[in-house]
Amino acid sequence: MAKQQNNRRKSATMRAVKRMINTHLEHKRFALINSGNTNATAGTVQNLSNGIIQGDDINQRSGDQVRIVSHKLHVRGTAITVSQTFRFIWFRDNMNRGTTPTVLEVLNTANFMSQYNPITLQQKRFTILKDVTLNCSLTGESIKDRIINLPGQLVNYNGATAVAASNGPGAIFMLQIGDSLVGLWDSSYEAVYTDA
């Protein structure tokens, strides 16, 4: 009986210490703005998390791992000469080893209406965080945007700099694809994180 009480006291003390440490963690911020991009009918993949490089600044990391507390993606599509569709897929690469995924690793075909690639979906390589379609019309709303807020997760890195080779498991990406080349799209990504 005394041993059980002692174990409970130790557990309660450990939880209290952990809570105290977590309340004093330094929250850092990273922002990435990407504007004036032409709609890509074959798709393009943008790396969102590898800009968090090693260093001592408020937008850098200490080691090879960060814990994202929350992150936000803001996307906007603008129809120029014809009505068009923009598709934005925000995803996490669970098995990344220093590369930027290709469009065909995420989608079955390079088409804005395509389903996800069944092989990588079956292997659970990617976690789709959000899949958003913006239909912009010249006779209606020619500019549309969407803001997506999500809780975070762990991101690992294989290096210190902002290159594809530094990507590790948990890296965050956005795929953009559309039905016409004449539209423009913008995105901004913000992550609030702590060193893990």
Swiss-Prot record:
InterPro entries: Satellite_CP-like, Satellite_virus_coat, Satellite_virus_coat_sf, Viral_coat. Its main location: virion. It comes from the Viruses. Ca(2+) 3 binds at residues 26, 56, 139. Pfam families: TNV_CP. Gene3D superfamilies: 2.60.120.20. Residues 1-19 are annotated as: RNA-binding. Binds 3 Ca(2+) ions per subunit. Keywords: Calcium, Capsid protein, Metal-binding, RNA-binding, Virion. Ca(2+) 2 binds at residues 26, 56, 139. GO terms for molecular function: metal ion binding; RNA binding; structural molecule activity. Its cofactor is Ca(2+). GO terms for cellular component: viral capsid. Ca(2+) 1 binds at residues 26, 56, 62, 65, 139, 195. It is found in: Virion. Self-assembles to form an icosahedral capsid of 17 nm in diameter. This is Capsid protein. It comes from Satellite tobacco necrosis virus 1.
